[in-house]
């Protein structure tokens, strides 16, 4: 049985995104460091990040997770769908690793997965994302921003 908990500061509903912000999810075991693979993440810290700063939105927690080898205690149990569903509304997903089938489902939910090689403090991930928004974002991020309605896509921009 998959179990999910939503911990938020104000309400138990999905909060509307702050105007001009990207909603990002960070895979974590301890709510302090980006240190989890997508499938084995016990928590996802969700933030709205804009050029001006960031706001904590919610923590989504799971009781039953895969180990980092991808093995499930109960074979055949779907552990991907509840996580993808819980991240609905996010634009970026930062994680240590993500398998092909999971990545395909995340992308089809219009969430851009970003693999980070080494553990990194959540505050550093937020700062780096904010810096990318303040400066000239790379083409892949401009595309995400346009799809999220955060920035207008100019007709002369490349689709790289």
UniProtKB/Swiss-Prot annotation:
InterPro entries: Di-Nase_FeMo-co_biosynth, DiNase_FeMo-co_biosyn_sf, NifX, NifX-like, NifX/NifY_domain. This is Protein NifX. Pfam families: Nitro_FeMo-Co. Keywords: Nitrogen fixation, Plasmid. Belongs to the NifX/NifY family. CDD domains: NifX. One of its GO terms (biological process) is nitrogen fixation. Transmembrane segments: none annotated. GO terms for molecular function: metal cluster binding. It comes from the Bacteria.
